[in-house]
């Protein structure tokens, strides 16, 4: 008899839902009715029930909690399966698809606003919860796929919003295409002709496992007119916003990483400097404005500036470990515009100082070890002694006994491998000092490469 009244009351609620024309009306289910009960007792959700039971999620949705479920009916499942059977969907995939319809908090229709929320599905590589893009401009639309048809079916462990389509797991391309803040990025990445990279495929492939640093529309506007930028250069700029691996914000640390952009015609990936001292910034020019937009195949961090291709100067100025070097190259040597010289990306310069540049960059500690820093007339040749022109000499090019091409000062350097104290290699400078240790290598810029050294090198004093 109790079940009879329970089902009769439920039927009355369903009739009320079907006849309701005001989307703001809230439908209340008896306090004893859980989300799982509602699905179980409503024949139009039998496909959803079967999926929940198969994955064990019916148990979770029958217990205590504060859930929001976007519930597809049978017609939505039929359309999604497109002639296949629910049994054809692998268990793990089905569970993630179902989780993609569930929020861990109770959100009524009035609580939902245009933007991102997290559901309880997870991205495979990072374990982070997947994002969901809600658009409330005209009703409630989820990930551009599924529209809420009946909102606010209240239960004792959350709320159900009936939706007209199953919500597939989103890819990075899903969010770039849907979020109006990324409309310029979407246009540039998917409509520019002449690219060798198919960005649509890169951002939509199930196994991408990438991090996209996505400039918003304002970032592109600040960059200025890009109509004159070649397709090859523009492609590299876009690739400079993509990192291998799904790197959520909590996994980022202050360090160098690599992007998918490459140096010249080589396969050497460009470096990117990540600084997490105050928020997250890249190459000292672009800050994360919204982190962790997690897709099924990677993560997006929205950034406020386009990350242009770095020069060796970019890294020197971005990395605080080189602040004394930067001061030496600028404030202490005003007669030589080192910043402009080392920012060059084209050859054929009248002074014969041409990229690529190989820079052996002393740390702040290296400068601190000096008794004093010479005046400009003495400092300029010292700085020139740290740069090789017209050569991108990477660590793989170094060998024991190698004598490098002459530095911009004139003297060559001699390489010793292995280095002392665990260093990658040692250098002997023009003055014969053989204890200069290379402690980090291959910070690859678009116009050269930086290797970090622990001492300031000195040219031959007799030159």
For the regions a protein language model found, what residue spans apply to each?
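Mature, structured domains of secreted/extracytosolic soluble proteins
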Residues: 4-7, 20-463
